Amino acid sequence: MPLESKPIGGNAAMRLIATCLMFFVPTVALSEPIETQKIITALTGDWNGDGGTDLALIVQTEPTEPMDMHFFLRDIEHNYLKPVEVVRDQILGEWNGYDRPGYENSDTEPELTALPNNSIRLFLPAMPVGSQRTNQTLTIAYRDGAFVVAGFSYDSEDYLKENTKAGCDLNVLTGKGESGKTNEDGTTSKLPVSVPGRVIPFANWSFATGLSGCQGS
């Protein structure tokens, strides 16, 4: 029977997270304390395909600063969630104040979805600044002991102008994909993308890297 993978929230999320944090060891760099109020979203799944239930968290840091993504793999033999990687400076989103005074709840937050092939879909919505908005989606997979970007897609539009939509869907590992844009007359043009495949750790990823691949360079 396949392992069920799903995002979690509310009390269920807090119970799982609290259980996870019980196993943090202060002497281990990856096992840093996490304030539960700063956890934006959590996702369970089997990232390394060993049959255990693993965990991914997106955690706020400070206002105006990028969020962190924490990855845990279950140690099946000893039955605990082991922190294996923290990726910083990759995730933007509005600061969510929850019940803290001086901050409002946000409506621009990253989203996590578990995929059937043990990978993670990370949706990064456009920040509400200016008229040009670009949403990004990354597919993150565990390969050879690290979390890498297996797929990249984006869609952009200038909401103050007509016919400005553009987008791309790229398999980073194979270098194959498709790009498209809306022309001035309202028609849509699509072009195949073919570049050398790459294995890029999530920690080293940049939007410019994905955009360059979509442009065939």
Which stretches of residues belong to each language-model region?
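Blade-edge motifs of beta-propeller repeat domains
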Residues: 32-35, 77-104, 192-197, 201
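Acidic/hydrophobic-patterned starts of short beta strands in beta-sheet-rich repeat architectures
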Residues: 49-59, 116-124
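Short glycine/acidic-enriched loop and turn motifs that connect beta-strands
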Residues: 62-64, 129-130
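Short, surface-exposed coil-to-beta transition loops
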Residues: 54, 66-68, 107, 132-137
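N-terminal signal peptide c-region/cleavage motif recognized by signal peptidases
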Residues: 25-26
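Acidic, small-residue rich beta-repeat scaffolds with periodic aromatic anchors
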Residues: 111-217
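Beta-propeller blade repeat segments, especially FG-GAP/WD-type strand-to-loop junctions
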Residues: 64-89, 139-144
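Beta-propeller blade termini
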Residues: 38-47, 99-118
